[in-house]
């Protein structure tokens, strides 16, 4: 059985790695130990997901819940564990489809501030110069690659009057 001290030690190891050490002076007495034990030692230290994948989940949740101070801190941590600036922005683009474009834009603005402070650089690609026909063809190719034969059956069947038009 894992002791509280072992959880705390595992948690603090992760906190140091991602620069997330807190202070009770900033929160409440005993709070930081609880965070080290439960959050970082108990959850972040679990097997099953690498820290980079955990950060994709964390950044998404913080963005969707508009936790800007924590988002700023965790963008910095995501860079420290190896996510690139571009990958972080892509997390916000993807999550923005579910949480709204203004929410994604706020997260991207915070990310750019953190990138500037941390010296994180990324290439800006020109996007959106395709004609509508080229864009539609790209989407159909992606659908075929993702779904294979299923891309034209069931709900994606062009003959399906309800959902077929979404896929053609």
Describe each PLM feature range.
Residues 54-62, 71, 75, 88-92:
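Short, structured motif recognition centered on aromatic/hydrophobic residues
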Residues 61-68, 99-100:
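Short alpha-helix boundary/capping elements
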Residues 88-93, 122-126:
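Short, charged low-complexity intrinsically disordered segments located at boundaries
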């Amino acid at each position: 059985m894992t002791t509280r001290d072992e959880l705390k030690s595992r948690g603090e190891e992760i906190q140091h790695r991602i620069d997330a050490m807190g202070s009770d002076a900033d929160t409440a007495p005993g709070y930081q130990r609880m965070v080290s034990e439960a959050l970082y030692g108990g959850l972040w230290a679990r097997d099953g997901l690498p820290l980079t994948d955990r950060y994709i989940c964390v950044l998404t949740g913080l963005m969707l819940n508009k936790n800007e101070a924590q988002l700023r801190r965790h963008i910095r941590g995501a860079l420290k564990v190896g996510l690139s600036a571009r990958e972080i922005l892509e997390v916000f683009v993807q999550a923005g489809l579910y949480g709204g474009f203004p929410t994604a834009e706020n997260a991207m603005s915070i990310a750019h501030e953190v990138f500037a402070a941390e010296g994180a650089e990324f290439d800006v690609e020109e996007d959106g110069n395709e004609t509508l026909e080229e864009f539609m063809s790209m989407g159909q190719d992606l659908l075929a690659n993702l779904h294979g034969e299923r891309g034209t059956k069931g709900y994606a069947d062009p003959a399906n009057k309800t959902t077929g038009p979404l896929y053609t």
